[in-house]
């Protein structure tokens, strides 16, 4: 496991771009979860006790001598988000009063891995830690967003550059398990992509559905697909590329110069085509794909595999939000079983 504590050494003064406002913590609008205790109340308690590790880091490693303001920023119910303004720069802080540092450690490792490719802009993580009142926090770079999601052509090209630049000699997986939304995402290193995707993506989601909803019908059909999907990959050259992992419209923006920004990842090393699994709510258009495939050429059978990668996210949405997503997932499974005559 990589040492997340080392991220604290990446102070704002060593970053290639100074932190900017405004980086918003966002998840899918429909995501439902019990909201954590008010971030403002937690922070005020810590301040009163003089035990605020966020302020301590900002006023030491963050190179600030004074915090000039703290304000809440719109976000979802998984985490709370705050803007810390200082005399040195501004910082984006996410807190969670119920979950320990492991969730943010996974996010920080993913952000740092993407940042190190020098391809597409992501917020640089600075520090992950525990809160004395319970829970955890992550401090990272602020990025001031522009007025739009940016140029689709530039997004496609830079995403492909990231996939091309970052490969793993460990196989498919990641340094730690992380989360996709609030669902655990298992990233055990695996040499073979089909095995990894079968076991740790489709298989894991199907098992969760069975445990939570008792849906043996979708489980049984899903297992038949897993056992028979090898022909979908014939002729494709696959390498373990660094993926954002949760690339939907809420995790895509642009900075004030119009350059694409991606955030809130669920990173792992996987087949590059799996990055398009959230395309059903990402808004990728023709310009995006044309620019992407200029850098990362389209592999034989791409169209046949596209829905296979959508399936993982439909199954996850079934687990997160309930049976409203069941029919979409089952339709994909049934179509593949007919195609494969399985």
UniProtKB/Swiss-Prot annotation:
Translocase listed as a keyword: no
Catalytic activity: N(6)-D-ribulosyl-L-lysyl-[protein] + ATP = N(6)-(3-O-phospho-D-ribulosyl)-L-lysyl-[protein] + ADP + H(+); N(6)-(D-erythrulosyl)-L-lysyl-[protein] + ATP = N(6)-(3-O-phospho-D-erythrulosyl)-L-lysyl-[protein] + ADP + H(+)
Entry keywords, A to Z: ATP-binding, Chloroplast, Kinase, Nucleotide-binding, Plastid, Transferase, Transit peptide
Range annotated as the organelle transit peptide: 1-46
Localization annotation: Plastid, Chloroplast
GO function terms (MF aspect): ATP binding; kinase activity; protein-ribulosamine 3-kinase activity
Binding-site list for ATP: 141-143
Gene3D superfamilies associated with the record: 3.90.1200.10, Phosphorylase Kinase, domain 1
Taxonomy, superkingdom: Eukaryota
GO cellular component: chloroplast
Active site, UniProt feature: 246
EC number: 2.7.1.172
Known function: Initiates a process leading to the deglycation of proteins. Phosphorylates low-molecular-mass and protein-bound erythrulosamines and ribulosamines, but not fructosamines or psicosamines, on the third carbon of the sugar moiety. Protein-bound erythrulosamine 3-phosphates and ribulosamine 3-phosphates are unstable and decompose under physiological conditions.
Protein family per UniProt: Belongs to the fructosamine kinase family.
The protein's name in its UniProt record: Protein-ribulosamine 3-kinase, chloroplastic
Taxonomic lineage of the native organism: Eukaryota, Viridiplantae, Streptophyta, Embryophyta, Tracheophyta
């Amino acid at each position: 496991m990589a040492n997340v504590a080392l991220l604290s050494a990446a102070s704002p003064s060593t970053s290639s771009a100074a932190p900017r406002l405004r980086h918003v913590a966002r998840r899918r609008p429909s995501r439902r979860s019990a909201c954590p205790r008010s971030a403002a109340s937690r922070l005020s308690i810590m301040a009163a006790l003089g035990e605020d590790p966020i302020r301590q880091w900002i006023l030491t490693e963050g190179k600030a001598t004074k915090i000039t303001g703290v304000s809440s920023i719109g976000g979802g119910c998984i985490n709370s988000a705050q803007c810390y303004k200082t005399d040195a720069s501004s910082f984006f802080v996410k807190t969670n009063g119920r979950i320990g540092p492991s969730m943010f450690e996974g996010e920080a490792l993913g952000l740092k891995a993407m940042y190190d490719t020098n391809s597409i802009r992501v917020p640089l993580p600075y520090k992950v830690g525990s809160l004395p009142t319970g829970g955890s926090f992550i401090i990272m770079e602020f990025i001031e967003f522009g007025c739009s999601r940016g140029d689709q052509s530039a997004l496609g090209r830079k995403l492909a550059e990231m996939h091309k630049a970052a490969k793993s000699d460990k196989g498919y997986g990641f340094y730690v398990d992380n989360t996709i939304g609030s669902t655990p995402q298992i990233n055990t290193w695996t040499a073979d992509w089909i095995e990894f995707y079968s076991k740790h993506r489709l298989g894991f989601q199907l098992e969760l559905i069975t445990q939570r909803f008792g849906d043996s019908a979708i489980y049984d059909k899903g297992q038949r697909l897993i056992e028979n999907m090898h022909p979908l990959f014939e002729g494709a050259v696959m390498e373990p590329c660094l993926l954002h992992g949760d690339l939907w419209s809420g995790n895509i923006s642009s900075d004030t110069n119009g350059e694409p920004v991606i955030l809130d990842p669920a990173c792992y090393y996987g087949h590059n085509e799996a990055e398009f699994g959230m395309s059903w709510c990402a808004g990728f258009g023709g310009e995006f794909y044309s620019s992407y495939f200029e850098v990362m050429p389209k592999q034989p059978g791409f169209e046949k595999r596209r829905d296979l990668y959508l399936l993982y996210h439909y199954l996850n949405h079934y687990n997160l939000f309930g049976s409203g997503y069941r029919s979409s997932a089952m339709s994909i499974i049934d179509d593949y079983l007919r195609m494969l005559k399985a």
